[in-house]
């Protein structure tokens, strides 16, 4: 019982909200690559590529076909790119940082590290595209692996330093709940109120105030 570990996080912007869900964490990816999701490709990446021909090189992003074959970005009409994928190579500037923490879900979201650690100092951190960025993510990874002989901090640091991408399955899945609460009570009974960043409180309040349906007559 009680809190074993806690950390600051960043969640999705209001127009790319982090979903509510239940799942189980089942694997970790150290030194992950990042395949850019279609929405981010269309709304964020393409405008930047059109403005700056060096953007892909600077961000260490490769262009590949749907089958995984490399494509030459100089040969692509970025106003009509067709079917392709952008994949950011593993490394210190990768958007997922040094580890991604994965669990089955239909939204294709996950927890992950980030190279932009300074953003955790912001008071309002609804700035991601739906996934959850976690401060001290490598520490969380060590706790999830729960194997101090094989996966102590030194072993994790060595793997990260190698730069090699590696998938590690958890010996025991860890339950995960993503919820959205704008009111919370801490262990001392202190109530705190948070901004309703996704504008959901009005619908919840309306549902709570709705009269209960009349009970069906018994026979």
Give, region by region, the residue ranges found by the protein language model:
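Well-ordered beta-sheet/strand-loop patches within structured domains
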Residues: 1-219
């Amino acid at each position: 019982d009680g809190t074993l570990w806690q950390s600051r996080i960043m969640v999705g912007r209001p127009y790319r909200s982090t979903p509510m869900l239940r799942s189980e964490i089942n694997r970790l990816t150290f030194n992950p690559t990042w395949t850019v999701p279609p929405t981010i490709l269309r709304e964020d990446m393409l405008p930047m590529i059109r403005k700056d021909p060096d953007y892909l090189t600077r961000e260490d992003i490769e262009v590949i076909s749907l089958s995984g074959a490399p494509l030459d970005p100089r040969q692509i009409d970025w106003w009509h790119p067709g079917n392709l994928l952008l994949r950011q190579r593993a490394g210190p500037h990768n958007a997922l940082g040094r580890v991604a923490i994965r669990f089955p879900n239909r939204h294709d979201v996950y927890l992950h590290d980030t190279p932009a650690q300074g953003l955790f100092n912001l008071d309002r951190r609804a700035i991601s595209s739906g996934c959850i960025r976690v401060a001290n993510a490598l520490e969380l990874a060590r706790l999830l692996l729960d194997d101090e002989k094989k996966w102590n901090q030194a072993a994790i640091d060595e793997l990260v330093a190698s730069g090699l991408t590696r998938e590690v399955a958890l010996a025991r899945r860890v339950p995960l709940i993503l919820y959205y609460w704008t009111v919370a009570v801490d262990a001392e009974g202190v109530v705190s109120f948070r901004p309703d960043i996704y504008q959901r409180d009005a619908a919840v309040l309306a549902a709570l105030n709705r009269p209960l349906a009349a009970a069906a007559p018994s026979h």
